[in-house]
């Protein structure tokens, strides 16, 4: 009875229950074990005060007893208590030497003993706050911190990286796939953009083309015929007119623009030499200016027509020189005047000489009267 008295609680308020719990996994130790735990708690608080670190920075004490060991047996309890007291002194040196070594590995390092403490029944009890000064009579253990170390071990860290990597890496990969189009599509789009002119370019070219065409003296029909001579495809005057007025479709405007541009270049390069001028004239009809004859010049031509309605080439040349007209203008005027006189004379009636008609008439002809009134 005296041998077992040292293992009994000091207060008599505890019920007379056996030290061993019916559950073989959980055991409640005596007062001596609680004194050892209080000493360990004080050492833990001193370690926090000196090192100013987080509770997770302290490594697991290898000298902490395992509840699954022979602590429950009364024959070994005293020896284990004495061994625990001596272990307190040795643990101070172990903590100071191993603190800096395990500081960088506090998350990824895990010892087998921490698993044993994680499986023990001590972590079911509420842990004591490191900052509190009150000493609770409950058993204190570091199982809560070792459980955190176990949770933040290599498996948990790899899980943490696997959860974090899709959030940081995959969006970049997805962005590159979404933002960068396929290469063949981008090349095709660049090629089409370079070939097709814009609407502003077409409008500017149509305006410049019309101005240069008029300056060179070509009609729209002349340009259409010239394109047929150069490229084998004759365009109508309506097509050239609609191009200048921007009334063609965008596709047809783009097709016709290079042809007209090349025609302008050919025309500019061939302007000046007589042989090339003949070549340009063969490509299309050149615009002819309408000749306006003055009233005095027209009266002189009428007098010469009354004398000789069909003059010779020599007479036409001398008359053109005297009136300062072109030979072709004088010739065309006499042709038109004869056609007019033929329309005025009825068919089947013999045509008297023009001089006899004008001399026998009491009044001058009608065209003479009109010409005199105008003068």
Swiss-Prot record:
One of its GO terms (molecular function) is DNA binding. Residues 286-345 bind DNA. Residues 162-171 have a biased composition (Basic and acidic residues). Coiled coil: none annotated. GO terms for biological process: brain development. Pfam families: Homeodomain, Pou. Residues 194-268 form the POU-specific domain. The keyword Transcription applies. Residues 1-29, 56-139, 151-200 are annotated as: Disordered. SUPFAM superfamilies: Homeodomain-like, lambda repressor-like DNA-binding domains. Residues 107-117, 130-139, 151-160 have a biased composition (Polar residues). GO terms for cellular component: nucleus. Acts as a transcription factor. May play a role in neuronal differentiation. Belongs to the POU transcription factor family. Class-3 subfamily. This is POU domain, class 3, transcription factor 1. The lineage of its organism: Eukaryota, Metazoa, Chordata, Craniata, Vertebrata.
């Amino acid at each position: 009875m005296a041998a077992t008295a040292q293992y009994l609680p000091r207060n008599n308020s505890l019920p007379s229950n056996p030290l061993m719990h019916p559950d073989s996994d959980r055991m409640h130790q005596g007062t001596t074990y609680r004194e050892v735990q209080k000493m360990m708690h004080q050492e833990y608080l001193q370690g926090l005060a000196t090192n100013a670190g987080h509770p997770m920075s302290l490594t697991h004490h290898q000298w902490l007893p395992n509840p699954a060991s022979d602590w429950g047996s009364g024959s070994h309890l005293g020896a284990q208590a004495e061994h625990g007291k001596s272990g307190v002194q040795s643990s101070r040196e172990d903590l100071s030497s191993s603190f800096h070594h395990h500081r960088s590995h506090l998350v990824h390092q895990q010892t087998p003993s921490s698993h044993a403490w994680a499986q023990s029944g001590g972590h079911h009890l509420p842990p004591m706050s490191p900052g509190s000064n009150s000493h609770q009579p409950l058993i204190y253990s570091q199982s809560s911190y070792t459980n955190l170390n176990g949770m933040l071990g290599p498996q948990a860290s790899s899980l943490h990286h696997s959860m974090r990597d899709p959030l940081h890496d995959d969006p970049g990969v997805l962005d590159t796939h979404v933002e960068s189009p396929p290469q063949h599509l981008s090349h095709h789009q660049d090629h089409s953009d370079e070939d097709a002119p814009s609407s502003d370019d077409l409008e500017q070219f149509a305006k410049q083309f019309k101005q240069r065409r008029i300056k060179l003296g070509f009609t729209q029909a002349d340009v259409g015929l010239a394109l047929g001579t150069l490229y084998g495809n004759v365009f109508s005057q309506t097509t050239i007119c609609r191009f200048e007025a921007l009334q063609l479709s965008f596709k047809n405007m783009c097709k016709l623009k290079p042809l007209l541009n090349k025609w302008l270049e050919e025309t500019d390069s061939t302007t000046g030499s007589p042989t090339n001028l003949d070549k340009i004239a063969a490509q299309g009809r050149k615009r002819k200016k309408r000749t306006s004859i003055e009233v005095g010049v027209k009266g002189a031509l009428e007098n010469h027509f009354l004398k000789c309605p069909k003059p010779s080439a020599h007479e036409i040349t001398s008359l053109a020189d005297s009136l300062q007209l072109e030979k072709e203008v004088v010739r065309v005027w006499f042709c038109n005047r004869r056609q007019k006189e033929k329309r005025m004379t009825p068919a089947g009636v013999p045509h008297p000489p023009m001089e006899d008609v004008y001399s026998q008439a009491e009044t001058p002809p009608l065209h003479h009267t009109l010409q005199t009134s105008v003068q």
